[in-house]
Amino acid sequence: MCTVSWIHQGPAYQLFCNRDEKHTRRPASKPQHLTRGGMRFLAPIDGDFGGTWIAVNESGLSLALLNRGPGSPAQISRGLLVMNLIAAPTLTEIMSRFATTNLSDFAAFTLLGLAPGLPAALLAWDGRERGVVADAGPSMPLVSSSVDPEGCASRRRATLERFRAKSPALRPGTLLAFHRSHAPVAGAHSVCMHRDDAQTVSFTWVTVDGAEANLYYEAGSPCRSLAGDSLSLALCSRPQTQCA
């Protein structure tokens, strides 16, 4: 499960993600340079199923996945859908592919899509019906949890409001502090989550400007402020065959 926030700064944007998982899950791999359908992108890879929960491509598009409840062994990993959709060159194309993909073998999820200069979009699947929200701004931050999902969402949003009250404008530093926060106390409801059976296992920070995309990744709980791994990718708006 995850907590996801973002900020737009003109055509640029920044995306922040805490990934929460049970201790029984295998650790993810560090971010990699990958290619799918001729599209280059950056993503860490899930250790169990080979998909990803967050990715950014050379068109400047980012996707962040929030699972809505556990899947079953018979279902396709939702992270593999992210790997397929991130090959699209535009947010419109991502929405189009989402609309035509057979989702019957996927458990419920919410997928955030970000593109330079455009409102964030939400693509949702509840296991029966799909939905699209063209402007997800009012929904920020996005929260999913397998334990008390409504309570976690309410408390984490309240935590962000307290952080925002300290500054007249939302800044990247505010969101960085938010994602490392234990307020009001470290536990199941805190943004940096700690439970007996699960915890926040990684923090990812994506930045996209007019020239390149950067993905910074910390394995482990973000409250520890461990040194992370960073990759960059030059943006390309030309036909893919012309991109270096």
Positions of the model-derived regions?
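N-terminal nucleophile
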Residues: M1-A244
